[in-house]
Amino acid sequence: MRKRKPILGLDPNVFFLGLVSFLTDISSELIFTLMPLFLANVLGASTVIIGFISGVADSTASLLNVFSGWFSDRLGKRKYLSFVGYALSSLSKPFMLIAGTWGPIMAIRFADRVGKGIRTAPRDALVADSTAEEVRGRAFGFHRAMDTGGAALGLLAAAVVVYFVQGSVLDLQFDTYRWLIILGLIPALLALFFFIFVQEPQRQLTNATSTGGAAQRPALPGKFKILLALMFLFTLGNSSDAFLILRAQNLGNDVLMIAIMLVMFNLVYALFSTPAGIVSDKLGRRNVIVVGWAIYALVYLGFALSNEPWTIWLLWAFYGLYYGLADGVGRALVSDLVPGEARGTAFGMYNGVVGITLLPASLIAGWLWQSVNPSAPFYFGSALAVLAMLGMVLFIRR
């Protein structure tokens, strides 16, 4: 295969995968970010139902992360599995236009998340396979920045739609949400077009793998298994962001203000993703992740204690900083801890643990909100983040 010229100093695969994620996130943020408000304000769904929809879709679909990552290792092909995932997500979204109860909405959201479950591990492995270790943090940082930049643009577009269709009305209106769905379909289809420029990279396999098949495939390292355990602990307190959105509304912020907050969150996330990756290349992945988790613990404590609408703005900004520091760097850490021929499996397990844990996390959060008070889920999340952070310091030396 002829070597292609770098784009913006990056392997073309990294660039085009970033562009695909950019467009996909514009679409997803337009359609799904304000979905909890549509469920609550228009359909009258309870927080338990909202938590169930968010949790079961993410968790069940995340089982596919493990399978798709393992299968991409066995097949030796990442691109086609990833494309199938993007296609399923994009082609399920038009059905939101005819969904009138929470049941069909859950089914559509499930299909979207199944697509994400199929594509995420092979896509992350594609990024890792296309880059050298010394610049891998930058590559993952760029990908997360593009992903999050798309989310910011999608939310900005959502804020514009909300402003012109319903103004500063506190509750989300049905016609507003319908326009969000229609606009979200355009970038979803563009993403599928740009995916054709992604190529399957050549991977260097160990002798054991190239000659012995699955039985002699290298075992996943102990440090990676510890990382999975820590991610389970952290994610158990990191419920769906739907609860952060509901908390913002609970404190008196209207739909337009919430949309603008989410734009700010994603801009901060995008702004710090690439620098965080570069810093992790120099100072170590673990150190950057620990700082990110510490910020998360403080942010969730702030959501628990906050009584004023304006404080939510500050908390969402720091929540974006946490994501910028921890998300892409966490993926780079996974690729550092495992051999190249097992990366698909490793990313599948990593994303699978995070996604599967979202179901109990969201159900616990919904129950705490409804049975105790709206602050309780955030105290719980903050406490578990501190425990996970201590575990990272003690057990992940690299």
Feature map (PLM): residue ranges:
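Glycine-rich segments within core transmembrane alpha-helices of 12-TM secondary carriers
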Residues: G141-V160, N351-A361
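Central cavity-lining transmembrane alpha-helices of secondary-active solute carriers
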Residues: F52-W70, V263-A276
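Juxtamembrane intracellular "pre-TM" segments in multi-pass secondary transporters
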Residues: M1-D11, E200-L230
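Helix-loop boundary and gating motifs at the non-cytosolic
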Residues: R4-S62, F224-M261
